[in-house]
Every structure is written in C-alpha cells, then in structure tokens.
C-alpha cells in the first residue's frame, strides 16, 4: 500500500487511455520512471530494455490521497535474513523503502503496529513524525505478533481489535464526511474483537530460523539510521488491559516508561502513574538478559543445523542411516 501510494503521488492516475493494452503499457513505463529515481539493479535495467520502457516526464497533475491505513508494515521480502534483502536491493532490483517520510500529498495516515513479533526480519517500518505539526500521522502499538495485528490467523479476535480501531479512524463523523460501513459487518468487528484473544508465536515451527530479536519500541521510535523520530509512542488501550486483566500471561518488555495511551473510542483510563511506569520499565530490564541468551541460542541452533546438513558431505553413512566415520 505504501509503495502504491508513493507511485500514485509521483505518477498520478492515468485515465486518458485508449484500451487495456495502452493502459498496461503506460502503467509499466510510468512505474519504470518512478523507479528511475533510485539506483537500479541489473535485472531492472534488462527488464526496461526488453519492454522498451523509457522514462516518462513527471506529470503536472497529481491527486491528493485522502487516507492510508496500514497494518504492521515490515521490511520483509521472503528473505529470512536482512542482509539478503539488502543484497537483492543493491544488485537486482530496489524493493526496500527509500525513506521514512510520508508524502505531503497524503492528508491522513494510520499505522497499526505489532508489539510482540520476535523476528528481526519483520521489524516495522515506521513513518517519521518529526516536523509533523498535526495529527496527520497516527501510529499505534497493539498486542500480538505481525498477523495478530494485521490478520491472517483463523482465530482472529485479537486482530479485530486493530481492525476496529482502523475502521473507526475512517468512519464518517458527520454526513458526507468519511466512510459509511454496512452496519451488520461493522457491528461484528466490535462484538468479536477481544483484547484477551489468543496470541500466536511468530517463530513457531520452521519460522524459528528467522533471526530472534524482540521489538524494542524505544529504539524503533528513535532510529537515526532509518530517519525515524517519534517523541512519544502511542500504546493502544488493549495492550494495557491485557496486562491488567491477567486473564492470560502477558508481560511485554517493550513498552517504554513514557508513552501515550490510545483508545478506539472515548478517553483511555490511566493505567499507571509516571513513577509507576518508570519503575515497571526498570524492573523489566532484567528480562533483557534472557533475551540476550535466547539470541545466543538462536545462533547455536543455526550453526548446529548447518553442521548437520553439511555432515552429509564429510561423513560416511551406511544405507540404514548409521554413520561409520569420515568420508
């Protein structure tokens, strides 16, 4: 969605086409022109030669984008290791976001972000909020892993919490402003959402080979390398209700001492004083030792797996699977 928005703000919407073939050709050429702004890899150069796409002049009329709503935008493109995505981006074709700024043509943008995903490759790509004088950008952290926030699991009551919040941001406050939803469907989002719903494991099964690194909200919101500055993270009420309710074990280490509570509707209650928040944050620092050792165990798992796979080539195996020595 964010790439599409960047493309539309650059190339506009081409409506003066003769037929579908003309529309397809212009779309390819405009996209090639959009990509020309960045350093391109060898594959994209060959593609442009084969399709005979030449850079088009930047259009003079570009539409505003009224609203962008995204769920846990991440910089993951199939590759389980970040370095592979960087290599692909540099040598083959640019796929990573070039910067963290929201285009001025976008009037409002909302981003629902996962608190609990533990895969380093799935680190969130935040919008930079420095220099923003209004609430044009609203980025809120929700309980659950990547697909618990964005949806995708069959047990989805937790993801409906983020969906309910996002829909609320787009609803019409008065007649002829905002979106109007089918009432029965809209009511289902509210009634079936549950901030005590089941949370999934982002690294279960083969996903355990994704690099282990729980999200650190403070670091993510103050990332100079990514050009992101967010003074006070917004935490959705559901995360704090989930902790307070104790209906299930939930004690995220990522929530900082200084944050703002956001509710889907109405005002959020106060869950802790500033002094209590600071004390909680300091107490949870002890969990950082466990995170450190779990990261060490991840690399031990990776090395042992590589050793097991490579043993097929330097050890002598009998047909029944018994190792009889070096090859």
Question: What does each of the following model-derived ranges do?
Answer:
Residues 1-327:
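Active-site- or binding-pocket-proximal scaffold segments within functional domains
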